[in-house]
Curated annotation (Swiss-Prot):
One of the primary rRNA binding proteins, it binds directly to 16S rRNA where it nucleates assembly of the body of the 30S subunit. NCBIfam families: PRK05327.1, rpsD_bact. This is Small ribosomal subunit protein uS4. Gene3D superfamilies: Ribosomal Protein S4 Delta 41, Chain A, domain 1, RNA-binding S4 domain. GO terms for biological process: ribosomal small subunit biogenesis; translation. It holds the Pfam family Ribosomal_S4. GO terms for cellular component: small ribosomal subunit. SMART domains: Ribosomal_S4, S4. The lineage of its organism: Bacteria, Pseudomonadati, Bacteroidota, Flavobacteriia, Flavobacteriales. Residues 26-45 are annotated as: Disordered. It comes from Christiangramia forsetii (strain DSM 17595 / CGMCC 1.15422 / KT0803). Belongs to the universal ribosomal protein uS4 family. Keywords: Ribonucleoprotein, Ribosomal protein, RNA-binding, rRNA-binding.
Length: 201
């Protein structure tokens, strides 16, 4: 499956929540997409359908393809800790996600573009791999000649989110990935246990 690049609101309506962040269009039409979406009754889903839906929600939320997501799950099963929580922690530790969490980009999709176009550094070195996994203490910054980019300045000026596991220096336009977040520090509405059950079949 290729990475989805279509209308975000349509996907958000599929899951019944604004999984990509603030979405005024979703607020106006928070019912399933389709001709009869506003009047359609949501039938009772099977256990498999619920588990699959949760996996799809996580993949769309973080913008991760199936092979990458499956590999991350396998890595989570080998790590210490609760598999589902470790999976979400791996998602949160990706460079594109941290760039988004720091407020450098208005969305994960925009964060991936910034990383891919070589606007982001890790510990002073250019890194253009969105899936790069950060370690505690890593410093993520905006490349010097990219600090004046309109998308970066506008995103930072509109950002009001604060996360305990990330620090940010507004003057240097760089932040530190202080620690891997605990489950309670991850705001996404994802039931990771359903994903574990699906992959464990």
């Amino acid at each position: 499956m290729a990475r989805y690049t279509g209308p975000k609101t349509k996907i958000a309506r599929k899951f019944g929540e604004a999984i990509f962040g603030d979405d005024k269009s979703f607020e106006k039409r928070n019912y399933p997409p389709g001709q009869h979406g506003n009047n359609r009754r949501r039938g009772k889903k099977s256990e498999y359908a619920i588990q699959l839906m949760e996996k799809q929600k996580a993949k769309y939320t973080y913008g991760i393809l199936e092979r990458q997501f499956r590999n991350m799950f396998e890595k989570a099963t080998r790590a210490q800790g609760i598999t589902g929580e470790v999976l979400l922690q791996l998602c949160e530790s990706r460079l594109d996600n941290v760039v988004y969490r720091m407020g450098v980009a208005p969305s994960r999709r925009a964060a991936r573009q910034l990383v891919g176009h070589r606007h982001i550094t890790v510990n002073g070195e250019l890194v253009n791999i969105p899936s790069y996994h950060l370690k505690a203490g890593d410093v993520v910054g905006v490349r010097e000649k990219s600090k004046s980019l309109a998308v970066v300045q506008e995103s930072l000026s509109n950002n009001s989110s604060v996360y305990e596991w990330i620090s940010w220096n507004s003057e240097k336009k760089e932040g530190t990935f202080v620690a891997v977040p605990g489950r309670v520090q991850i705001p996404e509405n994802i039931n990771e246990q359903f994903i574990v059950e699906l992959y464990s079949k």
